[in-house]
């Protein structure tokens, strides 16, 4: 009997996300039985719940993992029991694994970006990069750029809040 994995995406205004289709397609390719749910905290049925309450409910409901997106990538850090060193260095998580009560955080944004930039512009100059945006994903891309060998990184953000 194949184990069924219950996973989801937590965020706001994510009803049109392509993430569920991407994950379901990959699960089929790997022969995994997957159920991927959207947990949009702007949904009227969920809007009163905090991220911590959603995480507790996900644990009770048997979720194996949650992808975390805006605006919870940094908020989620407060709920982790353990995390990778990259989560601590980036200051954000985009993946929460729930093996029982030991809630663990990972950040795959940085490694995905590093792979993509290495594949798409491997010979780009790395002396100076100006990055616009410093939120949860922005921190991950900045981290990846430094790992890639950028010697001077200027980060700016138009969000004044």
PLM feature segments, named:
Residues 12, 133-135, 158:
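Glycine-rich Rossmann-fold phosphate-binding loop(s) that bind the pyrophosphate
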Residues 138-139:
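N-terminal Rossmann-fold NAD(P) dinucleotide-binding loop
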Residues 2-121:
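Phosphate/diphosphate ligand-binding glycine-rich loop within oxidoreductases
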Residues 150-161:
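NAD(P)-binding Rossmann-fold cofactor-contacting core
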Residues 99, 122-129, 150:
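Short helix-loop-beta connector
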Residues 142, 146-147:
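Gly/Ala-rich phosphate-binding loop of Rossmann-like dinucleotide-binding domains
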Residues 30, 148-149:
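Conserved dinucleotide-binding and phosphotransfer motif residues
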